[in-house]
Amino acid sequence: MSIKSDRWIRRAAEGGMIEPFEAGQVRTVNGGRIVSYGTSSYGYDVRCADEFKIFTNINSTIVDPKNFDEGSFVDFKGDVCIIPPNSFALARTVEYFRIPRSVLTICLGKSTYARCGIIVNVTPLEPEWEGHVTLEFSNTTPLPAKIYAGEGCAQMLFLESDEVCETSYRDRGGKYQGQRGVTLPRT
């Protein structure tokens, strides 16, 4: 497997791999500095949309991935999301992805957030998966933490195999195929 360059990412985006797509790095908006997004040398920095689900323990329930209680989240829409101390929030990317059959995509958090104790977690985007990426932001600090909608939050790295997989995510009818919006756990 080899990592794909900015040139490859731009060509793949022309075919609809990333929508909307930014061909370069955006670092300012209306003269103000932002957490960057867009194409980098060997990756694509995604933006966080303005839809959030903030985890709360008001129901004092057990967190069970096989039987997740949607009441454990408070829905929020806005330009800035405040994550409570030692808690987390779910969000989604602005971008919609269509991953090629020969490609596996790995997501890593941006250092701007990591250096503040905010960790971004996303599982790999498998071959032929498509949808908005659900992002998990963990606030590891004892203080409230800010997430900015419309700005960069994580980087996607595209790895292309020298051999096409026998069975893709679409082939096996993956449960998150075509997801739109913030998607909660499914079994």
UniProtKB/Swiss-Prot annotation:
Keywords from the named record: Hydrolase, Nucleotide metabolism, Nucleotide-binding
Active site residues per record: E136 (proton donor/acceptor)
UniProt superkingdom: Bacteria
Oxidoreductase among keywords: no
One GO biological process term: nucleobase-containing small molecule interconversion
Involved pathway(s): Pyrimidine metabolism; dUMP biosynthesis; dUMP from dCTP (dUTP route): step 1/2
Catalytic activity: dCTP + H2O + H(+) = dUTP + NH4(+)
Top-level EC class: hydrolase
InterPro entries attached to this UniProt entry: dCTP_deaminase (IPR011962), dUTPase-like_sf (IPR036157), dUTPase_trimeric (IPR033704)
Keyword field contains Nucleotide-binding: yes
Family: Belongs to the dCTP deaminase family.
Protein name: dCTP deaminase
Source organism: Bordetella avium (strain 197N)
